[in-house]
């Protein structure tokens, strides 16, 4: 009798995706982050659901409802901090997942890569709206500053901002709609992830060498299920350690001051995972130019497959490209640090130089270096 998992209409989908899936025998731990992102999404949806049961999206009561969750709800503090720090873990896994894709040439799977870029935008939008919900000082002013950027769009900008606000400033209407979108977007992300996977399984996974692994495949279960479970346990260990020992390590003290439209915080800044993009935005003195640079800093990922000039897929055997890749990583870390600094000398010029280097590396230096490496190998 044929195994039920191979014949049942629903179970055979799971079987072909997670059990009998042929996987390359040499994929490293860098391939764990896809499953970790799935776990992060589940954690966020579950903790978010329980938070939504107690949260009120009204400007008068939003801040006190979050306080109520932390003080009066059973393990409310744990749920709230798991959700807040879970977002940080989500972005750590996301950045490592994208970095792995760039290093090993996974972007050559065009459909999978483009849906991944869409997913990145969706997660960033969700995180931004979630940052507004506690209605602290940084929530209010962050929402005001970031939504105001849309006014840089010629002709329709001002109308668009007021349409998003639902009035003439960030107020109750804005908070209510942000809560609605923050609630629905994770399910859209889950649906997109459900499209991301079949496109990946259509081609099969890439591997560190960048060569075809058709000649040497192994079943996903038990080899990679065990490997993924280890990754999940390490993720949970890191998340619980952060939540239980230092829950506010990655947050901003201004979150604990109720929103006050009459008092601007000295330094308005987003959460740490947006600081690199925020630094790029601030480095351009022109408003429209800054907004374009901000969008392009992420959208540039969609261009990467078209900038691939090397005859080899992976960077595993390309030392010069490896050097540039790690310079890019260092540059992004520098931009992240710069985004959290006040707008004054020397941070202004440093931010501008780091922003120029970011675009130069991806658009010019990496493609030229790849051609140089081809030449060295007489290809």
Curated annotation (Swiss-Prot):
<dbReference type="GO" id="GO:0008121">
    <property type="term" value="F:ubiquinol-cytochrome-c reductase activity"/>
</dbReference>
<feature type="transmembrane region" description="Helical">
    <location>
        <begin position="226"/>
        <end position="246"/>
    </location>
</feature>
<dbReference type="Pfam" id="PF00033">
    <property type="entry name" value="Cytochrome_B"/>
</dbReference>
<dbReference type="InterPro" id="IPR030689">
    <property type="entry name" value="Cytochrome_b"/>
</dbReference>
<keyword id="KW-0479">Metal-binding</keyword>
<dbReference type="InterPro" id="IPR016174">
    <property type="entry name" value="Di-haem_cyt_TM"/>
</dbReference>
<keyword id="KW-0813">Transport</keyword>
<keyword id="KW-1133">Transmembrane helix</keyword>
<keyword id="KW-0349">Heme</keyword>
<feature type="transmembrane region" description="Helical">
    <location>
        <begin position="320"/>
        <end position="340"/>
    </location>
</feature>
<comment type="function">
    <text>Component of the ubiquinol-cytochrome c reductase complex (complex III or cytochrome b-c1 complex) that is part of the mitochondrial respiratory chain. The b-c1 complex mediates electron transfer from ubiquinol to cytochrome c. Contributes to the generation of a proton gradient across the mitochondrial membrane that is then used for ATP synthesis.</text>
</comment>
<keyword id="KW-0408">Iron</keyword>
<feature type="transmembrane region" description="Helical">
    <location>
        <begin position="288"/>
        <end position="308"/>
    </location>
</feature>
<keyword id="KW-0472">Membrane</keyword>
<feature type="binding site" description="axial binding residue">
    <location>
        <position position="182"/>
    </location>
    <ligand>
        <name>heme b b562</name>
    </ligand>
</feature>
<dbReference type="GO" id="GO:0045275">
    <property type="term" value="C:respiratory chain complex III"/>
</dbReference>
<comment type="similarity">
    <text>Belongs to the cytochrome b family.</text>
</comment>
<dbReference type="InterPro" id="IPR048260">
    <property type="entry name" value="Cytochrome_b_C_euk/bac"/>
</dbReference>
<feature type="binding site" description="axial binding residue">
    <location>
        <position position="97"/>
    </location>
    <ligand>
        <name>heme b b566</name>
    </ligand>
</feature>
<feature type="binding site" description="axial binding residue">
    <location>
        <position position="83"/>
    </location>
    <ligand>
        <name>heme b b562</name>
    </ligand>
</feature>
<feature type="binding site">
    <location>
        <position position="201"/>
    </location>
    <ligand>
        <name>a ubiquinone</name>
    </ligand>
</feature>
<keyword id="KW-0999">Mitochondrion inner membrane</keyword>
<keyword id="KW-0812">Transmembrane</keyword>
<keyword id="KW-0679">Respiratory chain</keyword>
<protein>
    <recommendedName>
        <fullName>Cytochrome b</fullName>
    </recommendedName>
</protein>
<dbReference type="GO" id="GO:0005743">
    <property type="term" value="C:mitochondrial inner membrane"/>
</dbReference>
<comment type="subunit">
    <text>The cytochrome bc1 complex contains 11 subunits: 3 respiratory subunits (MT-CYB, CYC1 and UQCRFS1), 2 core proteins (UQCRC1 and UQCRC2) and 6 low-molecular weight proteins (UQCRH/QCR6, UQCRB/QCR7, UQCRQ/QCR8, UQCR10/QCR9, UQCR11/QCR10 and a cleavage product of UQCRFS1). This cytochrome bc1 complex then forms a dimer.</text>
</comment>
<keyword id="KW-0249">Electron transport</keyword>
<keyword id="KW-0496">Mitochondrion</keyword>
<dbReference type="InterPro" id="IPR005797">
    <property type="entry name" value="Cyt_b/b6_N"/>
</dbReference>
<keyword id="KW-0830">Ubiquinone</keyword>
<feature type="transmembrane region" description="Helical">
    <location>
        <begin position="178"/>
        <end position="198"/>
    </location>
</feature>
<dbReference type="Pfam" id="PF00032">
    <property type="entry name" value="Cytochrom_B_C"/>
</dbReference>
<dbReference type="GO" id="GO:0006122">
    <property type="term" value="P:mitochondrial electron transport, ubiquinol to cytochrome c"/>
</dbReference>
<dbReference type="InterPro" id="IPR036150">
    <property type="entry name" value="Cyt_b/b6_C_sf"/>
</dbReference>
<dbReference type="GO" id="GO:0046872">
    <property type="term" value="F:metal ion binding"/>
</dbReference>
<dbReference type="InterPro" id="IPR005798">
    <property type="entry name" value="Cyt_b/b6_C"/>
</dbReference>
<dbReference type="InterPro" id="IPR027387">
    <property type="entry name" value="Cytb/b6-like_sf"/>
</dbReference>
<feature type="transmembrane region" description="Helical">
    <location>
        <begin position="113"/>
        <end position="133"/>
    </location>
</feature>
<dbReference type="InterPro" id="IPR048259">
    <property type="entry name" value="Cytochrome_b_N_euk/bac"/>
</dbReference>
<feature type="binding site" description="axial binding residue">
    <location>
        <position position="196"/>
    </location>
    <ligand>
        <name>heme b b566</name>
    </ligand>
</feature>
<feature type="transmembrane region" description="Helical">
    <location>
        <begin position="347"/>
        <end position="367"/>
    </location>
</feature>
């Amino acid at each position: 009798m044929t195994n039920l998992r191979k014949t049942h209409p629903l179970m055979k989908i799971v079987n072909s995706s997670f059990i009998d899936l042929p996987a390359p025998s040499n994929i490293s731990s860098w391939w764990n982050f896809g499953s970790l992102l799935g776990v992060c999404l589940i954690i966020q949806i579950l903790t978010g659901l329980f938070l939504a049961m107690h949260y009120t999206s009204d400007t008068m009561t939003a801040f006190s409802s979050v306080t109520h969750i932390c003080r009066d709800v059973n393990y409310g503090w744990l749920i709230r901090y798991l959700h807040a720090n879970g977002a940080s873990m989500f972005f750590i896994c996301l950045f490592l997942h994208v970095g792995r894709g760039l290093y090993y040439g996974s972007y050559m799977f065009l459909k999978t890569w483009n849906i991944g870029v869409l997913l990145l935008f969706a997660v960033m939008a969700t995180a931004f709206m979630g940052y507004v919900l506690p209605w602290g000082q940084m929530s209010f002013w962050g929402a005001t500053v970031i939504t105001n950027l849309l006014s840089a769009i010629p002709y329709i900008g001002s109308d668009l901002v007021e349409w998003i606000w639902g009035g003439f400033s960030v107020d109750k209407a804005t908070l209510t709609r942000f809560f609605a979108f923050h609630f629905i977007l994770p399910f859209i992300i889950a649906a997109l992830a459900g499209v991301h996977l079949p496109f990946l399984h259509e081609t099969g996974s890439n591997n560190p060498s960048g060569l075809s692994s058709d000649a040497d495949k192994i079943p996903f279960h038990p080899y990679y299920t065990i490997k993924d479970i280890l990754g999940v346990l390490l993720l949970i260990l890191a998340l619980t350690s952060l939540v239980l020992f230092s829950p506010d390590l990655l947050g901003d003290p201004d979150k604990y001051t109720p929103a006050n439209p009459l008092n601007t915080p000295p330094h308005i800044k987003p959460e740490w995972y947006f600081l690199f993009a925020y630094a790029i935005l601030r480095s351009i003195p022109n408003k429209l130019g800054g907004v374009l640079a901000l969008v392009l800093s992420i959208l540039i990922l969609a261009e990467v497959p078209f900038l691939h000039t090397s005859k080899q897929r992976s960077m595993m055997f390309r030392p010069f490209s490896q050097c540039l890749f790690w310079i890019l990583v260092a540059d992004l870390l520098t931009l992240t640090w710069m985004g959290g600094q006040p707008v004054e000398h020397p941070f202004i010029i440093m931010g501008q130089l780091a922003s120029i280097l970011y675009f130069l590396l991806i658009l010019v230096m990496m493609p030229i270096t790849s051609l140089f490496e081809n030449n060295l190998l007489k290809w």
